[in-house]
Amino acid sequence: MKDYYTWTYPDVPENVAQELLQLENSMVVVGIVGRSKCERANKMQAFGMSPPMEHTPADGQVQCYYKRGTSCIFLHFETTYDEPILHRMIEDSMADHQNAFDFDHFYEQMRSRFVRMMLLALHTCHIIVYVETGPTFDPTLVTVFQLLKFSREQHLKQFLPQMLRDTPAAKLGEKSRLCAPRILFLFENFPSDELKTRENVSAYEFQTEDNIYEMLRHHHIFTNSSPSSLVALPNNKQFVYFNAHEELHPDYLLKAIDCLNKTMFKPDMREEEEDLEILELAPFEGFCKPFGPPGERDVEAQQYKRQHTAWHFLQRHIQDALHGCFDEGSFKQLPHLGQFQLLSFPEWQGCMDTLTQLLVENAKDTNFETNNEEYKNFLLNFEDSLNYEKKFWAHLCELGLKKGISSYKSSAPANYGSATHRKLLAEATIAFEEEGRGPPAQAALARMAAICLKHWQDGRQQCEKLSLRSQPCTLPKDVPHDKHNSGVIHISSCNCGRTQGRREDPFNLRQANYDFYELIAQICNLCVKVKQYQFPIFEPSVSDYRAAAFDAAFPMLNTGKICTPQGEDENEDGETEEADEDTEEKEQAEGDNCSQQLSPTFGSDLNMSIAGFGASLNESQESSEQLSGSEHESPNSGTSSADTENELVLQIKEPARKESTPTGGFSTSTTEYLPGLVHTVSDFGLLPLFPSWSLACVGPSSIYSHNTGLQEHFQSGFLSGANFLLPWDVLLRLVHANKHHQQHHHNMHLQQHPGKKQQRWKKQGDRLSIKIFVGMEYECSRGHRFMMCAPDRVLRGGADIERDTCNKVVHSNMPLYYPCPCRSQSNYLAQLMRIHVVTPKAPVNIIVDPKVCVGKYTFTLGTIIPPRLSQSAYWILRLPFVYQGDNVMIAPPEKLDPDNPMAGGYLLPGMFGVAETDANMDLSNPSRMGSTAGTFIRI
């Protein structure tokens, strides 16, 4: 039968109340608070007491214990520091799906509830025993004591004396408590690595007492005066107890395993008399000793274990309270100056009811109203007043916010873009983090970002319209401006390549591909002299012309594809084979063959012609059949000769006396123009407003010397060693319609070139060897120019030029972008901007038809019939600076992928062709439309 009573406050059993009435004014109240791990949140196990089996712990619940024959009553406070209650509280918070789980808020709420119950214990108990499950003191308890002292001095002292005046708790007086309660510490476990001897346990208790005393004294938890102290510590009595010998909360599973282990071993038995003979076999006396009696133990250690219990530890302090010397040794003052009261059970119960209602129950009622402003402030702001960390973090974040905003504003220029704004905001964030920390840091950073954004948008924001090179406009957004400006300057050369100039970052296609070159042509003394190829452009017939809407009105129809002559694609592979028997011809001074100087009138009689490289969409069927027939017939003559295996066959037809006119007409739109560049699937009826390409003859072939390369006075900006063109030997075999015409053409060619010994072409019978010089020029935004000798190699000088070097260039995909060797950074990309061609003096014309693949588009010159290049001349084809499809601007890559250099775009191979010169053709005014202009072949 149990020797104690237990009940849940305030339901006191009648028999217990009768026994407590007999104590009169000699009842000591002991409060038990702290931590627990068992399911019933029992902290009374050290005193040999436990709640009923059906007991369920709850936050704010008080379980009372009374042992018969004693003068003390135990109040077991169940708080959020008990593990079962804390676990239930966490589950309730996690089950709230409307609000995300906030650990900081949860911890503050848990601590504030514990502090509220501790305040009740401090005002209703004489002795408080704090139970700790671990073997060490928790330093965070000092913070709890600080909060308790703050709450008592700032809140409770303001309203408790007044509100207790007309209640049963009026006997508590002005201090509103029984006394300065004596705090004791009970540790349920002793360190496992220490010996559990009397000396070790006592030494560990004394050491812990010294540490606790220093911490509480340092933080003024107790002082020399009882009224100003939150708790009291006895100086001459032990106030720390370690349970070193009793297992309070055993693990029954481990006990069962231990019992199983013991049954598996046979206990040792005493030696019998017959075993003495075995002992005589020992080599010396004492070699084998019998076991002593198993019941012998140290009497002193046994007595220490019986006396070293939590009950004996507590009774010393209870006797001090009963004998009236409770404050002796606790404070350096006279005992009668301290406040200590022993009440009867009914008097104490009235005080307990009143304080519980004021401190705990009224706080749970949200509708409770009171006229006492101090008490109302306590009920409303109690939790916020305890959250000192929240105030501390808020103060730090406020300091960091001021520092971050100051850093942002001090570094902000008059006008800046989003990139600068993000950079300044990142610097402001670093400045904020020097001071601001804690849970409100994210909200403070968001507030700082909003303030900085408002400061930026208040007249300091840039226009930030992206240029065609993805550079933002730096002009103020709020100030009207007709022309955008990014502040980025590029160095580019003119159409002829002689003059370099500074160009602003373009914001539209016209600025990029036309306006700059027209402007720099006015200051270039060569551009004004040359005659350029006139690309077909849009000519409006109305004033309200507009750009074509491709998605709605002009889908990519099959009629928009460029048609080729019948049979051309079939013979293309056979016609583009390289000649293995190219004649090696070394020229020392090619300029001696042509003495014509470049003059302002040079180029007025340029042989700019159009060859039938591709047939018009509306060409007559007869012209196509005639063209295809001439190409099919040419390989049939001479196929038995082994020497002509790799030769290009060019069939010479009889000169036509009258140019035939195409039977079908072709009309272009005069009300809608092509907004981008011409590509392979764009509508033939749409023309651009301006040409994005440029084709110009900059002089005779003699201005280029292969010994010296391109000179600086002629082509400026080339890197050293990268200013050479690549020689290209092409072997042709002429096939005439009949012998009469063959003899006629032979005599005509002899008359055209009398007495010419050094020429870049040789004719031996029906074979013709010509030499062409080709250069693929790349130019970076810093104005550096260089030639390429392979798709993945920059020309480094004459040593890089071999016999088949040019074949690698003209018969391979050439990347549109390539890293400039002037810088190691990948962001300096050079772009394929010009193609240099030096034509031979042979009676043939070189034809150019470039095709540039960028993204899903394949851009072309926009002419149905590609241009012819005149003989013995230096031609330069300038490519677009920016490419645009059907209302889709294609920006250059930020950096080049080494594994895929063609990702940014590339020039297709097979852009060159050769055709027989036709003297009867009118070449002065080439147009987009025309008839077939003689026999041609791709090279």
Curated annotation (Swiss-Prot):
Superkingdom, taxonomy of origin: Eukaryota
Chain intervals with Acidic residues compositional bias: 567-587
Low complexity composition-biased segments: 617-629
InterPro entries named in the record: SMG8-like (IPR019354)
Region feature Disordered, mapped onto this chain: 561-600, 617-645
Keyword Nucleus annotated: no
GO biological process, one term: nuclear-transcribed mRNA catabolic process, nonsense-mediated decay
Pfam families, per database record: Smg8_Smg9
Keyword Hydrolase: no
Keywords assigned: Nonsense-mediated mRNA decay
Record's function text: Involved in nonsense-mediated decay (NMD) of mRNAs containing premature stop codons. Probable component of kinase complex containing nonC and recruited to stalled ribosomes.
Similarity remark: Belongs to the SMG8 family.
Name this polypeptide is given: Nonsense-mediated mRNA decay factor SMG8
Organism of derivation: Drosophila ananassae (Fruit fly)
